[in-house]
Amino acid sequence: HNGIIENHAALREDLDVEFASETDSEVAAHLLAREVSAGADLVSAMRAVVTRLEGAFTLVAVDAADPDRIVAARRNSPLVVGIGDGEYFLASDVAAFIEHTRDAMELGQDQVVELTRDGVVVTNFDATPADTRRFHVDWDLSAAQKQGYDWFMRKEIFEQPRAVADTLLGRTNELGEIVLDEIRISPEELRSINKIVIVACGTAFYAGLVAKYAIEHWTRVPCEVELASEFRYRDPIIDPTTLVVTISQSGETADTLMAIRHAREQHAKVVAICNTNGATIPRESDAVIYTHAGPEIGVASTKGFTTQLIACYLLGLYLAQVRGTKYADEIGGVLKELERMPEELQELLDAQENVLNLAAELKDEPSILFLGRHVGYPVALEGALKLKELAYIHAEGFAAGELKHGPIALISEGLPMFVVVPPYSRDQLRDKVISNIAEVRARGARTIVLAEANDADARAHADHFIELPRVSTLLQPLPAIVPLQLFACEVA
C-alpha cells in the first residue's frame, strides 16, 4: 500500500478482527480478506474494497491460494505497469523497472489492473473496460543509476547544469521570441487574464514563491501562491479570467491534482509545470511546460527545483511577450542571462570544497537558521527544507525583514545562520540585509553569507563566505540554492 486511506478509522470500527498495528494499510488487508473469505475472487474483492476507501492510495494484493495473480488499484496515486518479455512489473514510477523494460502502461484514475501469465487486464472500479495509455521510455538507463555517486541526490545536484540547459533548449525562434509549443491557450485568452494563482506543494511551492516576484514584475498581473493542500479545502476566488499555474515534479501530487480539478470546475485556465511526460496533472491541464530534467530518483528535490524555476521564468517572460508589458530587448536580455546559467552553476559545483568543509564543521549542530529577503526568502525556506529532509536537523527559513518580529529571540552564541545577500543591482535590499547580518552577528550568531564575490561589505560581516556569480536579482535563486543543496547533502 502506498498513500493514505483517510477513512481508515471508521472502517476499522466496522471490522470485527484483532489488529496487529495502527496502520491504514492493515485495514485494507482485512477488508480484502473478508471479501475473499466470502467467496469473491481477488479482482472482485479489490473493486469492492476500493469503492469504500477515501483518500489517495495505491493497493497491490496477492492471494496465497492463487499466487499466480497480482491485482492492483489506484486512486489519486501513481501506478504504472512495466511490460517486459514474458514478465510484468508494478511500480509508482518507471525508474523502478527501467533496467528490465522500457515499455509501460499507465493506469488512469480509479482503475484496477490484473496481472497473470496470460497478460494484463485493466478495468474501472465499476468493472467496465478501461482505457489505458501505453508508452515507451526513451531516457538513458544511466539516468536511473548512481554512476559512482554515493547518493542519487548528489548525482542530481551535479546534473543541474545539463538539466537547466535541456529545459531551455528550443524555447526561442529565429527572431529571439519565446516559443512555448505546449501552451495550448490562445494569445487572446492570455491577454484577458487578470489574476494568476500558483498552486504547489513543498519544494515546488518555494519555486512558486520565486515565480511570483518575477511574473508580477514582468507582466504586472497580480500573482498569488498557494499550498495545494490549503487551496483545495477553502473557497478561492477564481473565474475564467484566472490563470492557475500548478507545479509538480512527478505530475501526480494528489493535493495539486485536486486543486486543478477545482480550478477547472470554476472555468479557470490551468497551466502545469511538470517533469513527467504523460502524467495525470499535465493530462488534466489546459497546457503544460515540461522541465526536461530527466528522472529525479532522490526524494529531496534538487534539479527539480532549478528546472521549475527555469520553466516559471519562461512562462513569465512569455506572458510579458504576449501581453506587451516588456520590450523585446528586455526579454532577450533575460534570456541571454538564463542561457549562461548552466555555466554559472557548473562553476559553483566545481568550487564545492568550500561548502563541504563547512558541512564537516557544522554537522553536529542541533539547529541552523536561514535568512533571505525578496527572492532570497524562498531560497532560505528551500535551504532549510533540504536540511530538515536530509540531515534531520532543526532548520528554519525566515524573511530578513521579519527578524525583529520573533526570530531574533532564537539567536544564541554560535548559532549558525545562512544569509542570502541580494546582488549589487538592488542596493536598497542589499544594504538592509547586510544590516541584518551585523545585527545577528552582534548577538553571537555564526554567519554564513552567500553573496557576489566582489561584495566586500557582505564579506566583512561573514564568519564564512560563499561566493555567488553576478546575476540579476530575479534570477539569483538559481545559483544561490546550489551551495545550500550541497551543504544539506554533505551534512547528511
Where are these regions (language model features)?
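Acidic/histidine-rich
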Residues: L53-E87, L358, K363-A391, V420-P423, ...
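Short, glycine-/Ser/Thr-/acidic-enriched flexible segments
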Residues: I4-E6, A64-P67, S77-L79, D85-Y88, ...
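Conserved phosphate/anionic-ligand binding catalytic regions in large, soluble enzymes, centered on
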Residues: H1-E6, A72-V81, Y149-M153, A163-V164, ...
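Active-site phosphate/pyrophosphate-binding segments
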Residues: Q160-V164, L168-V197, N277, A287-V419, ...
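Glycine-rich phosphate-binding loops that contact phosphosugars or nucleotide phosphates
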Residues: E188-R340, V421-P469, F487
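Conserved short alpha-helical segments that host acidic/polar catalytic motifs at enzyme active sites
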Residues: H1-W151, K155, E159-N194, Q346-L349, ...
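Generic C-terminus detector
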Residues: A127, K146, M153, R446, ...
